[in-house]
Amino acid sequence: MTLEQVTRRYVGKFLQKHNNGQNQIFRNWPAEYALDGWYIKMLSGGDITAHVHQGWLSGTFYVRVPAKKENDAGNIEFTLHAWDLPVVRDDFPRRIVATKPGRLVLFPSSLPHRVLPFSEGQERISIAFDIIPKSNQVVPPQAPA
């Protein structure tokens, strides 16, 4: 199987598991979507500052990660406190997901995330992607159906 096929299968299982009709992103899920992907190669001392994406759902597949000398070094962090902006609801705790080769992590594209700094002298290689609806009429995931 190609990485795209594995990713689409994983996304399908993710949707089946989480589509309980309560979440707008799943209620308005497009019949067809594109995967817009890129690879990221980082060396010792690397980090990626907090950011969001323009897709509906984003993901990262970890190819190679350095052996960790520090607990969270090189891991991915999700938080609503990424910038100096007011937080209306503070019921989403900071969450750190450990990276390991072969792990695929999916998350809403609008959720701020970053790569925590690492200093190990090894490469960190990942493949990131956004899921973008293929449609002439795009309904934002937060809009009512």
Sequence positions of predicted segments:
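Catalytic core of non-heme Fe(II) oxygenases with the double-stranded beta-helix
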Residues: 2-8, 12-106, 110-126, 130-141
